[in-house]
Amino acid sequence: MYDFAIIGSGVAGATLAKELRYRYKVAVIEKGKKPSYASEGKNVEINYVYGLGGSGVYSLGNAIKTEIKGYKIDKDIYKEIWEELKIKAPKDDFLNDIDKAFIELGFEKMEKFIDFDRCNKCGECARKICKAKWTPLNYLKESNANIITEFNIKAINYSNYYEILDDKGRKIKAKNLIISAGGINSPRILKKMIDDENIGKNLFIDTFVTVGGILEDSYLNKDISMLVYKKYKNFMLATHYSKLLINEIKKDYKDVKEKDIVGIMIKIKDENNGVVLDNDVKKEITKEDFKTLARGICKATKYLYKLGVDDIYTTIPRGSHPGGSLSLVVDEFEVREGLYVCDASLFKEALGVPPIVSIIALSKKFVREIL
């Protein structure tokens, strides 16, 4: 029997496994194996990754420290994260000309958990695993946990210990259970165990769009996306090369080359009005979200015009940071004795910035102050 079973091998699950490794026998349960994208939602497309390492495997390596409402994080935890992930901003000689042009317009360099000396600027951070970038797989390797993949949970029973069963008849027994399957799947798993009408509510996704156009020889496709950014009150702008954007542009300019596409992501701190259902996710763009997106698009468009872009195109609204979906149900990590939740589903409101270092910080806090 395990001391702890952790459901989910993403940023939170991997951090927990690493933090618990010295004192406890730990199992990490993962639904998938090879990381694959999943997409849900109709009005706003919500993307996440299932598989070993979760969405963090295909992150852009961004590190932004921000306040987490309801959770005070000790400064030493952030210092530790910066050291463990070797977080730093790129040197000037790493920047492409397009990055430098944005900096002249008031953007700043993004700190990232990427070894810039090893990065070959393939532009494939969101689609390929590489050794230049930290991912949750690094923590999993350090954890010494028993990692069980392709485990599709069918039921979870409790009788002085937790018994997790999958659809192949496998059973895992543990004294304690931590659900860390992310903003979409954690509420679905918890719903197998308790009945609460608020499970799945309060969902946010950090809604974003990418706007851009044609700028010859900008070579943003051979750069790390979000390498430079500019932060505003409820939104941020960052350089972003998007396949969806080039598809829109090609409707008018069929022969346009990828090297000639420049884009800016507008990521907003959206309202938490979404809900995770058993087989669906509902998330609308509220009036306030629309206003925030419009302000961001207006700012981004002005920067693009200054760079020399004439025609502006935009992608559909999407979201890749689902969270908040258990914040109305779980208070301070514990559901009941021996049953916990720790991941972005606990966030009470959208961060509006890349959340990985915040999730790591939350997970470290949980192990050190609660367990």
Curated annotation (Swiss-Prot):
Gene3D superfamilies: FAD/NAD(P)-binding domain. Residues 110-140 form the 4Fe-4S ferredoxin-type domain. One of its GO terms (biological process) is thiazole biosynthetic process. GO terms for molecular function: iron ion binding. PANTHER family: THIAMINE THIAZOLE SYNTHASE. This is Uncharacterized protein MJ1450. It comes from Methanocaldococcus jannaschii (strain ATCC 43067 / DSM 2661 / JAL-1 / JCM 10045 / NBRC 100440). The lineage of its organism: Archaea, Methanobacteriati, Methanobacteriota, Methanomada group, Methanococci.
